[in-house]
């Protein structure tokens, strides 16, 4: 590919318009809500900038705080006519330190520092003593072993283990914040994927209708099945996102992909489990595996870390985002950048611009070759594959997936069609779930009681909403029974002549 052809489809130095960002971008954006981004006006600005999914991090905040945020998201998105999903991220058994005096404090290279075990909230960490929750460092560490804080940004070395504390030395200093994660990479710490707190938080999430639940530190499909049982018993439609953070998850990735509704490449904790130089290769392999199975995959952690304080991303961050998009990621996620950062709206806007630019060079043909042997044994999957092929052969300008659960749209997205993809449903839960799927633009419509009405009304809705010219072809998928999940078995190529 020549430099001229590579740049011919990109924009001027001013970048794409806000309208382009929202209408053209296929990769979805997840923004974590926190102190920097709470409140109706800030949430509205993030949606306008391009956020599709909002993450509630249950490692921080109370149920009351999260409920206020959830209500704001639902109210604002309804007023804007935007289908936005809410992702509840369970904290899992992540080992954390206590709150810090003054919320943060510096520790310097070479300084002595003690680790102590405490579950008393009154004990505050400082520059000389760090209180560890969940795991007793005295029974976990041996002299010479490493201790990582804040995803490895800070590093300690254990020097002496006593009955009531572990004496350490700061190997890599920095600033510690309240309740940051702490890891023992040289120790074998075996903790369950889901804690009592997680089940209490999950109960809250189901009660208040979250769209996705992320389970941390997954080891196997059994962890997901355990969570699924609770969700199903409560009658919830929430999808489960498996966060890949442990070596055990890598060993069991095939069964995890079969059990989960989505995958998150959680590079922070995963980068503590494997050598950092292996992380890019693992990320690519995880994306390929999820793509092959048609499971949405999210790339997360430090996507734009510098923008917690800086007004623009680094060149390396921009390249990292582009690499994730061009590898086939369905979504990219912002964490501290939007939760506690100084420029949450700008972070989302930059991320949207970079993702959209990267998509202009996405190798659709190479991607389809990668998927040519993918599982198309089910009828809905075969229909999805055929819809993408038919759209190319007939020069259709849109693909419409009429769906009860959102699953049909997800399957079409698996094959990464060039054409705009619209997911039409009468169910709000399905419309919000589709907010995570690559390239899917959710639209509400009442499917009616029969197939013919469904096809006609879907074409009318899409043409009227998007002002598509008469005579334009569209590929439509649906089922004979319009309100039966999993019944997609029909594909039609139709002309839109309703304006």
Go through each PLM region and give its residues.
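Non-catalytic helical/linker scaffolds that mediate oligomerization, partner binding
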Residues: 1-499
């Amino acid at each position: 590919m020549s430099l001229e052809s590579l740049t011919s489809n990109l924009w001027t130095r001013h970048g794409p318009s806000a309208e382009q960002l929202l209408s053209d971008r296929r990769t979805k954006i997840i923004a974590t809500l926190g102190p920097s981004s709470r409140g109706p006006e800030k949430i509205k600005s993030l949606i306008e900038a391009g956020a599709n999914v909002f993450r509630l991090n249950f490692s921080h905040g109370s149920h009351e705080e999260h409920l206020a945020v959830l209500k704001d998201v639902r109210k604002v998105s309804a007023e804007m006519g935007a289908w936005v999903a809410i992702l509840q991220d369970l904290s899992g058994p992540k080992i954390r330190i206590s709150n810090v005096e003054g919320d943060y404090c510096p520790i310097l290279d070479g300084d002595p520092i003690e680790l102590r075990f405490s579950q008393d909230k009154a004990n505050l960490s400082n520059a000389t003593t760090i209180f560890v929750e969940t795991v007793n460092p005295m029974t976990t560490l041996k002299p010479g072993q490493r201790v990582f804080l804040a995803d490895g940004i800070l590093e300690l070395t254990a020097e002496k283990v006593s009955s009531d504390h572990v004496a350490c030395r700061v190997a890599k200093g920095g600033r510690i914040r309240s309740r940051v994660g702490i890891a023992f990479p040289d120790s074998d710490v075996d903790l369950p994927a889901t804690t009592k707190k997680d089940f209490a938080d999950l109960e809250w999430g189901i009660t208040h209708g979250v769209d996705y639940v992320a389970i941390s530190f997954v080891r196997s499909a059994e962890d997901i099945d355990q969570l699924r049982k609770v969700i199903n018993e409560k009658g919830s439609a929430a999808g489960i996102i498996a966060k890949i953070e442990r070596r055990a998850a890598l060993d069991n990735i095939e069964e995890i992909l079969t059990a989960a509704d989505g995958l998150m490449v959680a590079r922070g904790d995963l980068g503590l489990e494997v050598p950092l130089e292996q992380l890019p290769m693992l990320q690519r392999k995880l994306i390929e595996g999820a793509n092959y199975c048609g499971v949405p995959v999210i790339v997360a952690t430090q996507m734009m870390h510098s923008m917690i304080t800086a007004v623009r991303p680094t060149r390396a961050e921009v390249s990292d985002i582009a690499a994730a998009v061009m590898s086939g990621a369905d979504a990219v996620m912002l964490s501290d950048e939007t939760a506690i950062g100084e420029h949450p709206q700008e972070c989302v806007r930059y991320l949207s611009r970079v993702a959209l630019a990267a998509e202009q060079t996405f190798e659709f043909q190479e991607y389809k070759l990668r998927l040519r042997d993918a599982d198309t044994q089910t009828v809905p999957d075969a229909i999805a594959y055929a819809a993408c092929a038919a759209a190319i052969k007939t020069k259709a300008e849109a693909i419409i997936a009429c769906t009860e659960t959102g699953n049909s749209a997800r399957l079409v997205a698996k094959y990464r069609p060039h054409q705009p993809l619209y997911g039409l449903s009468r169910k709000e839960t399905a419309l919000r779930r589709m907010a995570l799927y690559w390239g899917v633009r959710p639209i509400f419509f009442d499917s009616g009681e029969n197939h013919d009405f469904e096809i006609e009304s879907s074409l009318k809705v899409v043409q009227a909403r998007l002002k598509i010219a008469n005579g334009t072809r569209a590929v439509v998928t649906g089922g004979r029974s319009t309100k039966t999940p999993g019944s997609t078995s029909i594909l039609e190529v139709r002309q839109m002549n309703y304006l």
